[in-house]
């Protein structure tokens, strides 16, 4: 996406859909989608990141003819029962604090950037929101530096967190 942005910097980029296959691997799906879809697309100039599809039945319906027949909805609706799936938590985690009008701001990590992928935003009410994923198999302790004020945090292996400062 950054290559496209660099070639056409005046054009807007939209990451419009990514699906989770059934059956879900909850921890693996959360980690991959937070890293690649939410953090990855936003760090590479996307104005949105959209998980697809929003809702499905236990039979993974409806879907368009020839469309994805094993796409798991963010929620599964079975008559009077609603099941929350990985897509729900991915969307909810990002959308709770990154509200419309938020703008991505620079963020980084002094170690291996693949170990602690992150993305930061400035919200319309002037708060800094940072999404961080511990992408390795051990606990990580790290610092968040906002204008010289340092906060220390830790994440267990595979854990994702949102910081609102």
Description of each model-found segment:
Residues 1-165:
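Substrate-binding and catalytic surfaces of secreted/luminal carbohydrate-active proteins
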């Amino acid at each position: 996406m950054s290559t496209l942005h660099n070639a056409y910097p005046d054009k807007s980029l939209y990451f419009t859909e990514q699906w989770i296959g059934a059956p879900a691997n909850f921890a693996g799906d959360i980690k991959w989608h937070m890293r690649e879809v939410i953090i990855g697309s936003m760090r590479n100039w996307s104005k949105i990141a959209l998980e697809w599809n929003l809702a499905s039945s236990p039979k993974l319906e409806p879907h368009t003819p020839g469309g994805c027949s094993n796409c798991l909805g963010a929620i599964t609706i079975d008559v009077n029962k609603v099941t929350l799936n990985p897509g729900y938590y991915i969307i909810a985690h990002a959308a709770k604090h990154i509200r419309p009008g938020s703008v991505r701001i620079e963020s980084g990590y002094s170690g291996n950037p693949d170990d602690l992928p992150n993305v930061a935003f400035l919200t319309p009410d002037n708060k800094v929101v940072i999404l961080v994923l511990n992408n390795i198999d051990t606990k990580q302790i790290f610092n968040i530096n906002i204008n010289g004020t340092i906060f220390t945090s830790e994440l267990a292996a595979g854990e994702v967190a949102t910081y609102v400062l």
